[in-house]
Amino acid sequence: MSSALMPVRTHIVIPARLKSTRLPNKPLLTIHGKPMILWVAEKAQLADFADDMCIATDDESVAKVCAEAGFDVVMTRSDHASGTDRLAEVAAIKGWAAHDIVVNMQGDEPLIPPLLLEQVKTLLVQDAESVMATLCEPIEDYNTFIHPSVVKVVSQNTNNQQRAIYFSRAPIPCDRDVVLSDEDNTQAPKNAYRHLGLYAYRVSLLQQFVHWSQTPLEILESLEQLRVLENGGHIAIAKAACPLPAGVDTQEDLDRLNAMSLTAFQDD
């Protein structure tokens, strides 16, 4: 059967690494008594558009916890340059077809709405010329706009498809008149958008990605998606259909989630 006639399958992959610099052992830290990675995996199970899901880790302790909870686990190498390189290894191990789609679900976002997972997958399906898809949300606060930990994205409409032009930790786009004025800035430009680290990939891209060397801008900005743009790939992008609750990067974030009602983690 030709690939054009074969069904496109969608796979959710949740990368889980213990070596977080700001919050060690993050996947196994508990929220209301349950390891965070299990909260995330249970969210993935609610995404009924997906054919399957798995957890990708390089740590035996994470693998043990997830396997004992009944989840599919893929052991990966520990020396990947980026999360996308890790996904490529998973796709190769699983033998997924080149035309399949992989949704990368962050392992530190236990409150992510499954709606956003489906949105990013649908976005890629609808843009046949793009090899990746991702989401963004408007930035209003100026301090958020200029903070280097907040990744900004600028995009353009091409053939009725919105596609990313560039991602940066710098405040882009720059309003020249505001920058040159002596007034204190309190608001970001009207067309400032924050990139949300949620991706859908074609497996064919993952197969190419691992053969590309890290690119100058990718290394400079420490943003793996720039490797795709620098190699001529298109990345579809859209404004998130609903807010994405903050994930867990610090102990304060973890404390905040533990202080929330248990019902906040349960979907109707």
Swiss-Prot record:
Transmembrane segments: none annotated. InterPro entries: Cytidylyl_trans, KdsB, Nucleotide-diphossugar_trans. GO terms for cellular component: cytosol. The keyword Endoplasmic reticulum does not apply. The keyword Plastid does not apply. Its EC number is 2.7.7.38. GO terms for molecular function: 3-deoxy-manno-octulosonate cytidylyltransferase activity. Pathway: Nucleotide-sugar biosynthesis; CMP-3-deoxy-D-manno-octulosonate biosynthesis; CMP-3-deoxy-D-manno-octulosonate from 3-deoxy-D-manno-octulosonate and CTP: step 1/1; Bacterial outer membrane biogenesis; lipopolysaccharide biosynthesis. It comes from Psychrobacter arcticus (strain DSM 17307 / VKM B-2377 / 273-4). This is 3-deoxy-manno-octulosonate cytidylyltransferase. Belongs to the KdsB family.
